């Protein structure tokens, strides 16, 4: 795990990036921007003590959205390797459940990422 500081306007990651880390927001506010969003307003907000960037890590897929700092932010990053170690130490049922929930969430968001309503 590593503590990282970002300035307002910086991206933690962009849509299409590899998903080597997931993040815990310690301080600030993160905006999640879907690829079709050309506005300055995020599709979703991440607040303090919330995790983000988990879907790509859980599913071993590319980032489906970008995470931009709406304010100066401090995050803690957890590498995919560290995440998998923690997950492998837990109940196998939990591992399957997390993966299933992530896939279902991505499917629910898919129309939004393709520009459909």
Annotate each PLM feature.
Residues 1-33:
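Regulatory nucleotide-sensing modules
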Residues 36-38:
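Solvent-exposed strand-loop boundary residues in beta-sheet-rich modules
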Residues 2-4, 41-44:
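Short beta-strand segments
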Residues 11, 43-97:
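Cyclic-nucleotide recognition modules
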Residues 83-117:
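A small-molecule sensor/coupling module
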Residues 1-8, 57, 88-90, 114:
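Cyclic nucleotide-binding regulatory module and flanking cytosolic helices
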